[in-house]
């Protein structure tokens, strides 16, 4: 039997580098100061759930910024009315919360309420770059999606990757919780 290596504090610190946490705007109202619970500069994703108000996202991002965190708001394409709303939302996120990174999602099975049908349609507007946002997360689905075929998911990721290269966006893929490492590694 192979001897296991003793885990050191340094090993634990290394394993927890560059991690992020996620919060809803409603849950954020229960936290007086995020710095009481998280190390400074922790990346905190701010969800965009069905029926949520963009003002709540802005306020949560602002609180996170004031508490020394890196707020990464989720922008759900199918929940946005039009480019004007997106432009105003980005303007507020940047000016009030110093946001420089966002996660663009389609919005799951949400009914499209405006001009954006998917995340790439948001990426194509050029509004992220206009507001100085060049680090952009997009959704990855290693275990598939009930809303989109596997082939369309693959094609969409390739399109987003090509757009990111063309537009100079620093794009990364963020996934939901995955419990089968083999699926993720094969993906």
Describe the function of each predicted region.
Residues 2-157, 162:
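Active-site beta->alpha loop and helix N-cap motifs at the rims of alpha/beta catalytic domains
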């Amino acid at each position: 039997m192979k001897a296991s290596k003793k885990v050191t504090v340094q090993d634990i610190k290394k394993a927890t580098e560059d991690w992020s946490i996620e919060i809803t705007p409603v849950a954020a109202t229960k936290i007086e100061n995020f710095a009481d619970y998280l190390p400074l500069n922790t990346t905190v994703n701010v969800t965009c759930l069905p029926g949520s108000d963009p003002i709540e996202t802005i306020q949560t991002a602002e609180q996170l910024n004031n508490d020394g965190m890196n707020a990464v708001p989720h922008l759900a394409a199918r929940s946005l009315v039009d480019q004007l709303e997106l432009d105003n939302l980005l303007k507020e996120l940047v000016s009030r919360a110093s946001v420089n990174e966002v996660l663009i999602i389609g919005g799951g099975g949400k009914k499209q309420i405006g001009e954006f049908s998917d995340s790439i349609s948001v990426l194509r507007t050029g509004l992220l770059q206009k507001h100085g946002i060049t680090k952009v997360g997009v959704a990855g689905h290693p275990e598939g999606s009930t809303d989109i075929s596997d082939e369309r998911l693959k094609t969409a990721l390739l399109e987003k990757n090509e757009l990111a290269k063309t537009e100079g966006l620093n794009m990364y893929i963020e996934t939901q919780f995955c419990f089968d490492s083999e699926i993720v590694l094969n993906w």
